[in-house]
Amino acid sequence: MATEDYTHPEFLVDAAWVDAHKDDSNVVIVDCEVDAAFARGHIPGAVLVPDNYEKDPDSGRLFLMQPEQFRTMCEGLGIGDDSTVITYDHSRSLTAARLWWALNTYGHTDVKILNGGWRAWIANGGAVDFGRAAPKSATFTPKRDESKLVKVDELKQACQVGDSVIWDVRSDSEWDGTNSRGNKRVGHVPGAVHLEWFNLMDSETNEFKPANEIRRILTEHGITPDKNVYTY
């Protein structure tokens, strides 16, 4: 699918682009699936993101890694300051987008998501590998951008401001409290709007929906460019 109509089309690449650039010296392709899925086949040259990298090693909670931990992980994957990173998964870009966000939060903006992920790669006739590639030698400098994060007190203040939208992207059962997902408390942030993340994805291709359709869906939920948007 063409991406020119997106505000930032450079955030996405298609399978043909990845195939043409996968051997470039500065390109690092990161498979964001679990070990078992990676072993069943992956893009040649791809490296596997560590399992549960998104969890704080001390508390086990889903916090962003501390700078030195994130640096160590990136260098272990061969991601350096000058790398062009391509992320992909089998899951409608859920985990690929999380790594995209984490890298951007740590100041690495040259990162793109393979639109359609593994399904798009196979549909394009892409080659499949089963071994593990040796990561490239790399130096990663974390530059954490706190503006991409919000603390609880700041979110509480945002609840009181008319120019803000708090967007709950979780499942229906998490939203209504019937599924705790292991959390001590259930429900949702007061005043939040609910739109599960996968509503922006094409269930047949695993690609992002067209830009005009995404805009329509977001607008119907009050998520518009004039608002400060907080997601969780």
Annotate each PLM feature:
Residues 3-81, 157-226:
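Positively charged, proline/Ser/Thr-rich regional signature most characteristic
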Residues 2-7, 62-158, 178-179, 187, ...:
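Thiolate-centered catalytic microenvironments shared by cysteine-dependent enzyme domains
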